[in-house]
């Protein structure tokens, strides 16, 4: 009886509940001062074209709090940190399930761990 109930539960559960959402950051470990940093976030388990989904980039300098950098919405609308707006560009390639962040004119104060997050 328990097996039957579990099977029925699986059959009636929407597929999005069973899917696993993952976001994986990739990019260089080090960049030199004045260079441009390009980071890629490859997502799975959801679509970048979904009207309720967006992806943000955030960073955390050593020993400091998280800092939000940029966000891209499903309709391609973009939002940037006011203090870094002139150095940041966020874009997405829905066909590759990727969100790319570029940050120009890197400086030692930009040393941090960079993360992407679904919001």
UniProtKB/Swiss-Prot annotation:
UniProt region (Complementarity-determining-3), positions on chain: 117-119
Chain residue ranges for the region called Complementarity-determining-2: 72-78
Region entry Framework-3, spans: 79-116
Keyword tags: Adaptive immunity, Cell membrane, Disulfide bond, Immunity, Immunoglobulin, Immunoglobulin domain, Membrane, Pyrrolidone carboxylic acid, Secreted, Signal
PANTHER family reported in the protein's UniProt record: IMMUNOGLOBULIN HEAVY CHAIN (PTHR23266)
Assembly information from the UniProt record: Immunoglobulins are composed of two identical heavy chains and two identical light chains; disulfide-linked.
Listed name of the protein: Immunoglobulin heavy variable 2-26
